[in-house]
Amino acid sequence: MTIERNNAMSAIQLREGVWSVGVLNPALRVFDIVMESRYGTSYNAYLVTGGEKTALIEAVHKDYFEDLVSNIEEILPVEKLDYLIMNHTEPDHSGGVRALLDRCPNLTVLCSSSAKKFLTSIANEEFPCRVVKDGDTLDLGGKTLRFISAPLLHWPDSIFTWDEADKTLFTCDFLGCHFCEPSMRDTGIHPEYRRYYEAELLNYFNCIFGPFKPAVLDGLDKMPARVELVCTSHGPTLSQSIGYVKDCYRQWAAPAVRPDGKKTVGIIYCSAYGCTRALADAAAKALTADGLQVTTLDVVFAAPETVSALVN
């Protein structure tokens, strides 16, 4: 498969000692096989420097590893990286790990215990690794990072990384969006396109976090109180939109309650010859007679996000 490269992005300084060094993929239209990405995406990574040590957060999709290296080297030689923090190990974040380990022999990886298992399989070798737990810290020299356990947001391995000095929270997929914004800032979204970003924010939530709504509420409660910048793994970083996005997530993750008090049932089916449809219709009729609110969906014609919303 030929990869269309229209991903030019330089390192962007976000705060003192914090840079965005990820890459853009504006041409992407389908993410993870089934999720539509109408406005492309970005594979975000962040460089955090202290007075003594330097950490990279995430390692992007493997097809964009050299672009990541190029962005890092606008700031420092990639071989001088001391730490790689993996908040989550899905291949769009961890694809460059093996190549980075080869390039940086003194690199130490920091991640959760489950992430260590996944990364060992991904890299197919042992590597220097420090497993971190909730509340553990990393001193970069005048800048301390604290790790926050965030399981099922959206994998068992997920953690947040909190930069107290800069009031910056690195959340990986949480609060993100498949929306390719070259400025890497929510303040850079053109006002006329804001509604598209907000629509994609909901689509992203439904497809990725819809199955984990209790974990979403826990994750929101674990966020530090004075966050000024949220650095996600996809889409623009958040500063002016932090409160808005958090409120959206809390609303979308709240248990659904019908005003009339009726319980709801979703029936999802696929029928080649109409037999399964007849069964679905019969089940819907019986459940409705019992006082339940029933919605049926034929997966052949329903959009994935519609099915996901019904299930979740």
Show where each model-derived region lies:
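Conserved beta-strand hairpin/beta-sheet module of binuclear metal-dependent hydrolase folds
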Residues: 11-74, 160-163, 167-171, 276
